[in-house]
């Protein structure tokens, strides 16, 4: 947004809530990598944006790759844990109990464990946990979160 010189950005104090669903959680992961540079102070606009993030929601994160669906490296999770007040993880059996992609459930569990060990305010909800993994319930999560 182009703001005339001398005028205040009207969005400056807006809170930012980031939500990723399924493969869209890759974008949240990239933001985590970028946020790790905030403490270095090398990018003032990124610092301003990062300071306004009030919550991040992962909704049934997953992709077709064979690893790195969830970030588990504490080096990157540390900034997230310290600077994002609310971290929420909503998952279904479609992602965390898929026998053909067992790493997703393991990585998700490690992601949450590492954030908790770093002091993050993270909460997890497993939706449809009494159901078999199903693409239908994967999308139904969007109605129930």
Show which residues each predicted segment covers.
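Phosphate/oxyanion-binding active-site loops and adjacent basic polyanion-contact surfaces
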Residues: 1, 23-27, 104-107, 134
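Serine-dependent carboxylesterase/thioesterase catalytic core
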Residues: 2-85, 96-99
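C-terminal catalytic histidine-bearing segment of alpha/beta-hydrolase fold enzymes
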Residues: 88-145
